[in-house]
């Protein structure tokens, strides 16, 4: 996940950085630092952010080389 994907997904969900941090179980400065490009996250924190976002039906999109290319909305798990 890139900082741009994180910001876009959070915006689509209408979440503040504080809300994403709460849902992911990470510190607010972790989200802020990552989204601003000033902080490289450890894999566990990226995974936590990604789980929180994907649980709400956002898919992170990558090309065949693994490069981030965007996000897409899908129904949350159990949704219609």
Where do the protein language model's features map onto the residues?
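Short basic helix-loop element that most often maps to the first helix and adjoining turn
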Residues: 4-19, 75-79
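DNA major-groove recognition helix of helix-turn-helix/homeodomain DNA-binding modules
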Residues: 25, 45-60
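Non-catalytic, surface-exposed connector residues within folded enzymatic/regulatory domains
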Residues: 40-43, 65
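Helix-turn-helix/homeodomain-like alpha-helical modules used for DNA recognition
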Residues: 58-80
